[in-house]
Amino acid sequence: GTGVAAFDYTKLGSDGSEIPVQNGTWSESGTEADGTHWSCVRDNVTGLVWEIKTPTGTHSFNNKGSWQNRNTLADTTNAEGLCGLTNWRVPSLTELLTIVNNGRQNPAFDVPRFPNGKSQSYWTSNPVSGVGTNAWTVNFFAGIGNSKAKTSNFQVRLVSGDYAASQFDAARFVDNGDGTVSDVVTGLMWKRCPEGLSGEDCSNGSASTLVWGGSMKAARDSTYAGYDDWRLPNMKEMQTLVDVTKNNPALNTSVFPNPNNVLNYWTSSLAKKTSPVTQSYRINFQRGLSEFKVRTGSQNAQWLVRDDI
């Protein structure tokens, strides 16, 4: 496959086969044979297959609708059998965030693989827990999840396949008995409690809140449970813990207790919205919102992670 950064995509033709030339540039009048036209993209990391938008027709980037009508395109596309598939659906927030490229903005996705995409909001399948009038979108200008009124009109980008990280059941997480938790889906190990907190239910102590630079250093300096390679998670990694079926916090609290209601956590990811870059991403776990905050002016908690190898 091809892709920027750590992304790995394969372009697919209308029948689902891999097109012969993978590094071609999209053209509306192009052909699959010369690699200038494709209908879907397979993410070789997640296994998900994504619909490609077109300037006109059923899959046009101009087609928008309310959340209540979000499944209309999926019904049409399944009848069409796009890319040989008939299980197209609206993606979850977790799934749609997997194609966000936090290394860029406007748009925050891999443009050569996803032509005709817009720096706009796209619906997900998830309602906002605790806010009955709203549903989750992903804003592809900034690459963040947002809560929007269900009556708003936004695009849908369809997905096909299953993604294990969308499940938050106990089988996914293994308590290692030393204050760490292993995620068998992502291959990451997390500290069970935020920095500064300890105990079976993470109720002892007080949460550490620092500016971004201090948080990065605190993570690097940690030797918790005998490991010396702790770090702040990047945006992608932190988002894998957000369970939007819950709120306040949007977490599986049977795995990650949060009795002190610590909600705001730094990530290591920089927000490319200013030059020079002065902001970084954080996750607000009240409902799972992604936000930008000035690195030197905002103090947030740290939730440490390492590669579980």
Regions found by a protein language model. Give the residues of each.
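Glycine-aromatic-enriched surface loops/turns that form tight recognition elements
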Residues: 1-89, 93-231, 235-309
